[in-house]
A protein has these predicted regions:
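Extended intrinsically disordered, low-complexity coil regions enriched in Ser, Thr, Gly, Ala
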Residues: 47-80, 117-139
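Intrinsic N-terminal pre-sequences and regulatory tails
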Residues: 1-19, 23, 139
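Short, low-complexity cationic-aromatic patches
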Residues: 27-38, 45-54, 97-108, 114-127
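Short amphipathic alpha-helical segments
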Residues: 15, 19, 34-42, 57
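Terminal domain-initiation and capping elements
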Residues: 2-9, 28-32, 63-66, 106, ...
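Short, solvent-exposed interaction modules
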Residues: 64-117
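Amphipathic alpha-helical segments within well-ordered protein domains
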Residues: 19-22, 41-45, 91, 110-114
Length: 139
């Protein structure tokens, strides 16, 4: 059972991730940033084979993991296997808000993951993704 202290710590970690992403995007709106994070995490999740998607999810902090797995239906999912499909998945996730550049969000979220997860975890995820999506990750 998660106690109050653990929940407060999990909240703090999730807020750090949001603050980091807001800085990377140059945004000041936490709601929009959270929506963009969730949309990009869903696109990533849907670009990976099921086992690889689970491996990535297991590396995320608990509240970010909740965003990642929200509304996931592994058997009925539509794969984001091309760059266009990946970016469309992000755009759909932010309700096609024209002020949000899906490409910038993809780069920022993948850079956030690269900064906060181990290099080995990132390389494993990249290896499982379609080659068309590799250049969305930081060099």
């Amino acid at each position: 059972m998660v106690g109050t202290l653990e929940f407060a710590q999990a909240t703090h970690i999730a807020e750090e991730w949001l603050d980091d992403l807001m800085a990377r995007l140059g945004w000041h709106d936490r709601y929009r940033t959270c929506a963009a994070l969730a949309a990009a995490l869903h696109a990533l999740r849907d670009a990976l084979p099921q086992e690889a998607a689970i491996d990535v999810g297991n590396q995320l902090p608990i509240l970010v993991r909740g965003l990642y797995y929200d509304a996931w239906h592994p058997r009925g999912r539509s794969a984001a296997r091309t760059r266009a499909a990946f970016l469309a998945r992000i755009q759909d996730g932010v309700h096609r808000e024209p002020a949000i550049d899906a490409d910038a969000v993809a780069h920022a979220v993948l850079a956030l993951l690269a900064a906060r997860l181990t290099a080995a975890e990132i390389e494993d995820a990249k290896a499982e993704m379609p080659h068309d999506l590799h250049n969305l990750w930081p060099s």
